[in-house]
Amino acid sequence: MGLLLVIVLVTLVFKATGTAGRSFGRLQDELQLQEARRHILAQLEKTVCYDAQSVRLQDDGKISCRMLEGCKQVTVYSDKQGIYQRTRTNKGTGVNPVSLEEVGVFGWQVRRCSPQMLCVSFDLYRNGRSMRVMQYFICYSARITDDA
């Protein structure tokens, strides 16, 4: 009888910790998606809204910015389930990730809403969980043009 009680208690404990573990995993995934969203939007806001002198939306979804800081060109684009920023200066070119490595980015779209307003939308994915992101940016120092 005592052995049966121990087996039942151990089974209940394992089920409870398994459920708690899965819930904790889902919570971690949700927090990671929120952090990725915040990080991407903050980087885009800094680049497009504050530091750009001109913004050009390319047909392939790239955002090309000429920066207030002289002789600097920044292009933001989506590639291989991530968002990247290519920076060109007189001294050379470099590429840095804007998105977090642990979170996939899909469905990247950009469109001009007005001469100074830009809409960016994309989906974030992590371990089967997803989040749709859509944000409007007002370019304070730049005018937005489209490829025609």
Features from the language model and the residues they span:
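Aliphatic-rich helix starts adjacent to a transmembrane/signal segment
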Residues: 1-42
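Broad hydrophobic/π-residue packing in well-ordered secondary structure
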Residues: 17, 24, 43-46, 74-81
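Alpha-helix exit/C-cap motif
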Residues: 39-60
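Short, cationic motifs built from Arg/Lys/His that form the positively charged side of catalytic pockets
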Residues: 49, 82-86, 141
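Type IV pilin-like appendage domain
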Residues: 54-119, 129-132, 147-148
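Beta-strand-rich extracellular modules
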Residues: 123-127
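Short, low-complexity, Pro/Ser/Thr/Gly-rich segments in the mature regions of secreted, periplasmic
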Residues: 134-148
